A protein has these predicted regions:
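Acidic helix N-cap motif at the loop->helix transition within catalytic regions
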Residues: 18-21, 35, 46-55, 96, ...
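Donor-binding/catalytic cores of nucleotide-activated saccharide
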Residues: 72, 93-197, 207-219
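A conserved acidic beta->alpha catalytic loop
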Residues: 26, 33, 41-51, 68-70
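N-proximal low-complexity "stem/linker" segments adjacent to membrane-targeting elements
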Residues: 1-29
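Catalytic core of nucleotide-sugar-dependent glycosyltransferases
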Residues: 203-210, 216-244, 265-282
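Glycine-rich, basic loop-to-helix element that forms the pyrophosphate-binding segment
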Residues: 67-83
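Membrane-interface aromatic/basic loop that binds lipid-linked glycans or pyrophosphate carriers
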Residues: 266-314
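Short aromatic/hydrophobic "clamp" motif used to bind/position activated sugar donors
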Residues: 88
């Protein structure tokens, strides 16, 4: 009988030889040992492939998959295809998790939740990425509604621990070839989940670095992919029967779109991404509606007014 570990920890690896050891050490030294660590070498051009093989040779819980460079989404999907654990964690190869993470998650595993919710902290800025709502097991759509009402719903997949069979049953995978894959994956997962529970455990440490995969990406593709994800999610949300949830989700997409515009990551690419109809049709909250109307009158005016308000608050 093949032993199935409690946790599968999936780590896509690409061009992180200076950070990989800290990441892997935070995994192999977990105080709870019934885990497997799946390192997916995504065609890394540096010393990472050899490092991965060394870890696997030293610890039978470490498994390595080498594949041609295919991007973060495909690497995570590869890890999922090889995973055997009851629950799955995603860890980026330049980040770390607390050594007692799996130990502290065990009581929540016993509750058979589809998704266990955790929190993270951005090392350097000390900015905490957390969830504002605490409850017993609730349906995923209910949690989304409450979290959006509280204004606290981080989309990063690394903050959530997923029951592996739940992901399989609902065919939940990451969309290949795009940045911001979490922006689509996380809401889809929550809308499919029957039982989600918040752990209150802050376990994940984001290590921000200037040469990271995300920071170096071409900003145009970054903006375009997020824009496309917003439009795809709009189609998904419009099919929801729960009107209150639908309104909150659509409103959150308008807020995300306007934030993207405000950050200067849309308007510099011309009219292709200026989508007044989307903003006007999907704004729901009175504050968002006011912003949408101003944006519809004049996107540059919206940008200047928003900047002025930010400066006044600073």
């Amino acid at each position: 009988v093949i032993h199935k570990p409690v946790f599968s920890i999936i780590v896509p690896v690409y061009n992180v030889e200076n950070y990989l050891n800290a990441c892997v050490q935070s995994l192999i030294n977990q105080t709870f040992s019934d885990i497997e660590i799946i390192l997916v070498d995504d065609g890394s051009p540096d010393n990472c492939p050899a490092m991965c093989d060394t870890y696997a040779a030293a610890d039978s819980r470490v498994h390595v998959v080498h594949q041609p460079n295919s991007g973060l989404s495909v690497a995570r999907n590869t890890g999922l295809a090889h995973a055997a654990g009851s629950y799955v964690l995603f860890v980026d190869s330049d980040d770390i998790i607390n050594l007692d993470t799996c130990q502290r998650l065990l009581p929540f595993v016993d509750k058979s939740a589809d998704i266990i919710i955790g929190d993270g902290i951005s090392v350097g800025s000390r900015k905490k990425l957390s969830h504002g709502y605490t409850a017993a097991c609730v349906r995923g759509d209910m949690y989304l509604k409450l979290a959006l009402h509280e204004g606290s719903m981080p989309m990063a997949a690394v903050l959530y621990i997923y029951r592996r069979e739940f992901l399989q049953e609902n065919r939940l995978v990451f969309k290949p070839g795009i940045l911001h894959e979490d922006e689509q994956f996380t809401p889809r997962a929550f809308l499919s989940a029957e039982r989600v529970i918040e752990s209150g455990i802050c376990f994940y440490h984001y290590i921000t670095r200037d040469d990271s995969i995300t920071t170096q990406q071409d900003l145009r593709k970054n903006a375009a992919d997020l824009y496309d994800s917003i439009l795809e999610l709009t189609d998904l949300y419009k099919q929801l029967a729960d009107q209150k949830l639908k309104n909150r989700l659509l409103d959150s997409l308008v807020t995300k779109y306007l934030s993207l515009f405000q950050a200067g990551r849309l308007q510099q690419y011309g009219k292709a991404y200026i989508h007044k109809r989307f903003v006007l049709c999907n704004a729901r909250h009175p504050k968002t509606v006011c912003k949408a109307l101003l944006f519809a009158i004049s996107p540059p005016l919206y940008w200047h007014v928003n900047n002025w308000v930010k400066q006044r608050r600073a």
